[in-house]
Amino acid sequence: MIGTGGFIGASLRYTISSRVPKIQNIPAGTLTVNLLGSIVLALLTFSSEPESVVYLVNIGMLGSFTTFSTFAYETFRLLEDGQNISFFLNIFLNVMLCLLGVSIAYLALML
């Protein structure tokens, strides 16, 4: 089950990341998958889904859909290329938007 979710997540990540263009040198594809993954993870974690769904989606699909390593690499490349503003903006946007997404998902389920 986890492997099936991993295949789905990796395929979705490639599809989305390759179609979302950079915005002001910010790798918006990675930001998009991390934000969507954070929201879906929060929705499933804070709801009462069966354990099998959690394994398939949270561990399998979202584990391969979201990507911290790509975020770290792309952020490092911004710094290496001397794009200091984009470097800091990328870090800020990834962390803050993903936390905001989790917070909104949590609040939506609590209403």
Curated annotation (Swiss-Prot):
The biological process GO terms on file are: cellular detoxification of fluoride; fluoride transmembrane transport
* Compartmental location: Cell membrane
Locate the transmembrane regions by residue number: 26-46, 53-73, 91-111
Checking Pfam families in the record gives: CRCB
* UniProt-annotated binding residues for Na(+): G63, T66
Membrane-topology descriptor = Multi-pass membrane protein
Organism superkingdom: Archaea
Summarize what activates or inhibits it: Na(+) is not transported, but it plays an essential structural role and its presence is essential for fluoride channel function.
> Reaction catalysed by this chain?
fluoride(in) = fluoride(out)
What is a single cellular component term in the Gene Ontology annotation?
Answer: plasma membrane
User: Does the keyword section mention Transport?
Assistant: yes
Q: Does this entry carry the keyword Zinc?
A: no
Arranged from A to Z, the UniProt key words for this protein are: Cell membrane, Ion channel, Ion transport, Membrane, Metal-binding, Sodium, Transmembrane, Transmembrane helix, Transport
Tell me, what is one Gene Ontology molecular-function annotation carried by this entry?
metal ion binding
Record family assignment: Belongs to the fluoride channel Fluc/FEX (TC 1.A.43) family.
Give a short account of what the protein does: Fluoride-specific ion channel. Important for reducing fluoride concentration in the cell, thus reducing its toxicity.
Q: Which NCBIfam families match?
A: crcB
This one is known as Fluoride-specific ion channel FluC 3
Its organism's taxonomic lineage begins at: Archaea, Methanobacteriati, Methanobacteriota, Stenosarchaea group, Methanomicrobia
